[in-house]
Amino acid sequence: MVREKVKVSTRTLQWRCVESRRDSKRLYYGRFILSPLMKGQADTIGIAMRRALLGEIEGTCITRAKSENIPHDYSNIVGIQESVHEILMNLNEIVLRSNLYGARNAIICVQGPGYITARDIILPPSVEIIDNTQHIATLTESIDLCIGLKIERNRGYSLKILNTFEDRSYPIDAVFMPVQNANHSIHSYGNGNGKQEILFLEIWTNGSLTPKEALHEASRNLINLFIPFLHVEEETFYLENNQHHVTLPLFPFHNRLVNLRKKKKELAFQYIFIDQLELPPRIYNCLKKSNIHTLLDLLNNSQEDLIKIEHFHIEDVKKILDILEKKIEKAFQKKID
């Protein structure tokens, strides 16, 4: 455990870790301070940081299990001490660390009798287990057990949908939250107009990230959220129908759209559906699942918004931009002709 005496700067805004400890493989704690802050600033930063820590940081979880030996998720299997439901719950508790994009597969293949732990999971190279001792199941007889696993990286919660799967695979409730808890408190000092504040941040993580890493990632996410506001005046325009506002924060062909707009005063983006854009099936399905149905819906999303869509990549955004540039140019040309 590392603990420091709190020394506060009275001039330059600084942050520092004043306490750091590892309670177990799956529980880290960190305490940080930021000072000096003007009255009210500590609460503003503390609330935003806590929400970013709990809701904006991505984690890696097992989201699905598949085995030919499992008839349904509340069954019992001869030779296994735990019920299928208990095994799924144990898999849900496995803490993973990764830099995944998209989904990956893993597998457990064990011959009994014996104990199955996280150490028995055969993982792809981009994924690591935080605690190899986490219990999964106990084989009481000489049986073979093979379980296929699906691993994903995401944020927030993913609740399983109750359904019967013909391929004998079962969804697992996933909590993609490396930060288990975060608190902030404020200490005020000084008098009158010179009153200042110190912000204290406490962070508990599951071991897949250290509190310091979580703090850095939450800070980057908050910064990225505010960046578009720095360019809002230059990168916003209004259509002439006075009903629809289109924002193109980072689209590289924005200036070209503005120039074309001078030649023709109205193009009904809200009546152009993404079905007409001839997008690749995977990109089309991702947009539909995100309630993006028209060109207007699409243009109201920044590149950052699109990248946040599940299973979306920067290459997909580039593909969309190429297609849109050609389609919109052709549409404007028809209007001009």
Swiss-Prot record:
CDD domains: RNAP_alpha_NTD. GO terms for molecular function: DNA binding; DNA-directed RNA polymerase activity; protein dimerization activity. The keyword Plastid applies. It is found in: Plastid, Chloroplast. Gene3D superfamilies: 5' to 3' exonuclease, C-terminal subdomain, DNA-directed RNA polymerase, insert domain, RNA polymerase, RBP11-like subunit. Keywords: Chloroplast, DNA-directed RNA polymerase, Nucleotidyltransferase, Plastid, Transcription, Transferase. Its EC number is 2.7.7.6. It comes from the Eukaryota. GO terms for biological process: DNA-templated transcription. GO terms for cellular component: chloroplast; DNA-directed RNA polymerase complex; mitochondrion. DNA-dependent RNA polymerase catalyzes the transcription of DNA into RNA using the four ribonucleoside triphosphates as substrates. In plastids the minimal PEP RNA polymerase catalytic core is composed of four subunits: alpha, beta, beta', and beta''. When a (nuclear-encoded) sigma factor is associated with the core the holoenzyme is formed, which can initiate transcription. This is DNA-directed RNA polymerase subunit alpha. It comes from Arabis hirsuta.
